[in-house]
Amino acid sequence: PSIDDFVGNKKNQRQLIFLSNPSNPTGITKKGDTLKELVERSSFKNSGLLIDEAYEIISNPPVSAMSYIKNINNSNLFVCGAATKGLQAPGIRVGWVVASKNNIEILGNFSSFGIGGVSKLSQIYLENLLERGRTDLAHSAIPKFYDRQRLKYADAFNKIGLETFSGSGGFYHWCKLKNNKTAEDLNRALFKSGAAILKGNDCDMKREGDESSLRNFFRFSFGSLDPDSFKDNIEILSKALATINQ
């Protein structure tokens, strides 16, 4: 969606705009002047902007809306992060919000009776994860690692006849099958090798099932794959594609 799509034209009405950036699950990332415009047009007066940046450092280079705000205390910007992706610690189930002091105090009052809080053990664990030396290392190493994986798989997919539609963030590739083959066809072939992909129609908000315009698309996740398994993974996928296209 464009910035105009997000902001709309209801200037005198209160509104809160929600956005994941990089987008989950597409990996499309708003950056540069586009992100700057979004922050400037939607973070002040009657408008608020909540950006989920859980995948921030999966993108190379990392992108944050915080780069475009001069004084967060004079804004309605909310930036969310999580240990799940960037800090590679999904088990502790901890996230955070950066916002103005006033908005954080309001959220803190609500969480005390509405949410319950985070366990002491998770807080201690996260405190160590956020040690500056470790976060500097994560911001350097993680984007490079996933970028290598992203580019390597994209190149291989193009060579075996898949069309890719992927952003620069996240650890997924969106691929389109040729010859009107469906993701359901591909999964049936992959199951024989103990593998699977996520069907595009399972991510269709219109919930059109087999009639979905996304039925020829699938999502391939390289996030949890051992880099050394690359050849085997491409071989399994190539055989499955050959099976459904014969």
Please report, for each region that a protein language model flagged, where it lies by residue:
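Active-site phosphate-binding strand-loop segment of PLP-dependent enzymes
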Residues: P1-P61
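Short beta-strand segments
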Residues: F18-N21, L50-E53, G81, Y172-K176, ...
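Helix C-cap/helix->beta junction micro-motif
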Residues: F44-K45, I160, S193
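Conserved core segment of the aminotransferase class I/II
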Residues: K70-K144, L151, K239-A242
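PLP-dependent enzyme catalytic core of the Aspartate aminotransferase-like
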Residues: N73, K192-S193, D204-Q246
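Conserved glycine-rich beta-strand-loop-beta hairpin in the small C-terminal domain of fold type I
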Residues: P143-A154, E163-K176, F191, S213
